[in-house]
Regions:
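Membrane-interface alpha helices of multi-pass inner-membrane proteins
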Residues: 188, 203-225, 231-236, 259, ...
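Aromatic- and kink-enriched transmembrane "portal" helix at the membrane-lumen/periplasm boundary
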Residues: 120-124, 158-180, 353-364
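Short periplasmic/luminal acceptor-recognition loop of GT-C membrane glycosyltransferases, typified by
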Residues: 93, 227, 457-545, 563-574, ...
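Extracytoplasmic catalytic/substrate-binding loops of multi-pass membrane glycan-assembly enzymes
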Residues: 63-77, 86-105, 117, 272
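Transmembrane-helix motifs of polytopic, lipid-linked glycan transferases
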Residues: 125-147
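Specific aromatic-rich, kink-prone transmembrane helix
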Residues: 177-200, 209, 216, 372-375, ...
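Perimembrane helix-loop-helix junctions
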Residues: 194-199, 229-262, 320, 324-329
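Hydrophobic alpha-helical membrane-interfacial segments at the cytosolic entry of transmembrane helices
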Residues: 49-54, 245-269, 300-317, 332-349, ...
Length: 608
């Protein structure tokens, strides 16, 4: 009862803190002179310099600061494939097909350097140029398909994509690979269906863009298999669309997908039968950390979506209340650009988002409410206000299909996955910008400010907080106190304890785990197995792995993977999994029967 009352008091305190923050912030905004709001972008050079500095800070911080077990998983699954483990048969990771792309970079690095020193940093160096390239392609595509849009607005949309990633992870792993391939596929479709001349007239697209879209769609399915739903939606779009070239368009889009799928299945069938492939697919789908009933999943989605809807609804009601109070009761006008439909709502949502970044318990970048708000408002604008940008409205719908497809395979809730709506937000900005410019002479400036808010806000959120810290919601300035000195994470700055633990494990690993061992690592940080030359005894390396009977199935199919060394994550001999109710501990004592136990500060090693 005391705990319940304490939780209620904490919740009430946070709500009160949020209300006070909003009142003070909105008071400041509404008290500003109209001239300030009208001229906020007057000095474009200063704002360009601010944007450049924000992008530099964002890039440098995320290149050198922060480390996370999710990032380690993304590297480890690629490393397994690069070192010769086979898909499906020896690798049971749920995201293993995405490792095809990661493994290329890892294999190249290992060939050039002979080891994994600085590998994490190298993969981050690969990430940022690719992210910048997709952002530049987005900018050029917006300029080609929406020629009436201001060049600065299109540039800000490109920058918004650059500073928004699905997670606070900056390597070519499954979430970022999906983000790139989905964006490239969509942008190729826009190039084909939405190309316009300088006078705004639609011109016939070239079929090569549909071919490229099909190739990127295939890559996207490999990065995130549930994206097959996006493929089906695009297929339906091509089928129902009236076109004299319908069958050519279908062939151009579908044949690359079919050909790529045929190559993939041919490769898999080169070392296993179709029956074995189906058996392995069942084992992978049975991965414990992603196993929930339909009811549990729907309940979790409903709770998260309800929370998000409540926040956005409250923001909308507050914005309508402020407008009514000022215009109807006080008989005055809102300051400057806040008069535009929806602008006050976006400002309030942004202020709530800032509060989350500064004071809430959410880690790093979440929950990105403004991306959801802009996407939904873009839909509303097209349906109820201005039906000019039909193609971008359809893009918003496709972005929501993408969002739902990610939810199907993820063990994260809807509020944490809003970052996958980045292209929906960009399309929403296009719909809003076109409508605002028709409604008000200040519409051009308003969409510039909204884009600027999004860019600088996201650059701040991804820069302000450190990922992977021992403290869940921790600030970079206060917490960066350590450096990972050698090995996989060499050169990366983290909080003191994360670096200390890594460096300690790095120092003891050669003594604790002999090279050539077949190692079962029990714990979320399986990337430590990359500190030596080992064979992987675990079916998968996901950081949320459940250690259950799947291990026995894996060793029955792959008897050469039965471990001779078992490593538990621990704290000075204290093992979380120790106890008679633990499957892995019972297996260790009854079947593995260790002959030797070695306790180190952060790992405990058992040998036969």
């Amino acid at each position: 009862m005391l705990n319940k009352n304490g939780a209620c008091r904490r919740t009430a305190g946070l709500v009160l803190q949020l209300c006070m923050f909003l009142v003070i912030a909105m008071g400041k905004i509404l008290c500003y002179d109209n001239c300030m709001m009208k001229n906020i972008l007057k000095n474009k050079k200063i704002w360009k310099i601010i944007c450049i500095l924000a992008i530099i800070a964002y890039t440098l911080k995320n290149l050198f600061v922060g480390a996370d077990t999710d990032e380690g998983y993304g590297i480890m699954v690629g490393y397994r494939l690069a070192m010769g483990d086979r898909l499906l048969l020896e690798m049971w990771e749920p995201h293993q097909t995405s490792a095809i792309f990661t493994a290329v970079f890892i294999r190249l690095f290992v060939m050039l350097t002979g080891g994994v020193n600085y590998l994490n940093l190298f993969l981050r160096l690969i990430f940022f140029p690719i992210q910048a390239g997709v952002s530049a392609f987005l900018y050029k595509t917006i300029r080609r398909t929406v020629p009436q849009m201001d060049e600065n607005v299109a540039a800000l949309m490109g920058l918004l994509y650059y500073v928004t990633t699905p997670k606070s992870i900056f390597i070519p792993e499954y979430s970022n690979l999906h983000n790139w391939f989905f964006a490239l596929m969509v942008l190729c479709l826009l190039r084909y269906f939405g190309s316009k001349d300088s006078e705004g007239r639609t011109v016939a697209g070239k079929l090569r863009w549909l071919v490229l879209a099909g190739i990127f769609m295939t890559c996207d399915v490999l990065a995130y298999p549930s994206m097959v739903l996006v493929f089906l939606c695009c297929l339906v779009f091509l089928l129902v669309r009236r076109s004299e070239r319908k069958w050519k368009e279908l062939c151009a889009y579908v044949l690359p997908c079919v050909a790529s799928a045929a190559v993939m299945f041919t490769y898999l069938l080169s070392y296993m039968t179709p029956q074995k492939m189906l058996e392995m697919a069942g084992e992978i789908l049975g991965e414990g950390s992603h196993q929930t009933t339909v009811g549990e999943k729907l309940l979790g989605w409903g709770s998260s979506l309800g929370e998000m809807a409540m926040i956005l609804l409250c923001a909308l009601l507050v914005s309508l209340g402020i407008r009514w109070l000022i215009e109807k009761v006080w008989k005055k006008k809102l300051p400057g650009l806040l008069q535009l439909p929806g602008m006050l709502f976006f400002v309030i949502v942004f202020l709530i988002q800032i509060w989350f970044w500064l004071f809430s318990s959410f880690n790093a970048i979440y929950p990105q409410l403004l991306l959801m708000a802009v996407s939904l408002t873009g839909c509303y604008t097209y349906l109820r206000r201005d039906k000019t940008e039909k193609l971008f409205y359809e893009l918003i719908l496709l972005a929501f299909v993408n969002y739902f497809s990610v939810l199907l395979l993820s063990n994260w809730g809807p509020m944490l996955l809003v970052t996958y709506l980045i292209l929906g937000a960009v399309a929403g900005l296009v719909c809003l910008g076109d409508y605002w410019q028709k409604e008000n002479t200040a519409g051009k400036k308003a969409i510039q400010i909204l884009c600027l808010i999004l860019v600088l806000g996201n650059a701040f959120s991804y820069t302000w907080l450190i990922l992977g810290s021992q403290e869940y919601h921790s600030y970079v300035i206060q917490n960066v106190r350590g450096i990972n000195r050698e090995g996989l994470r060499a050169g990366i700055l983290t909080d003191y304890m994360t670096a200390y633990r890594y460096n300690n494990n790095l120092a003891v690993w050669p003594e604790a785990v002999p090279d050539g061992s077949t190692v079962l690592y029990v714990g979320p940080s399986q990337f430590y197995c990359m500190l030596g030359e080992h064979k992987q005894a675990s079916p998968d390396t996901i950081c949320s792995m459940i250690y259950d009977e799947r291990l026995l199935d894996y060793w029955k199919i792959n008897p050469d993977r039965y471990p001779d060394v078992v490593v538990f994550e621990s704290c000075y001999g204290d093992i979380a999994q120790e106890g008679e109710n633990s499957f892995i501990w019972n297996w260790l004592m009854e079947d593995f029967q260790p002959a030797e136990r070695k306790d180190y500060p952060y790992i405990t090693v058992f040998m036969r």
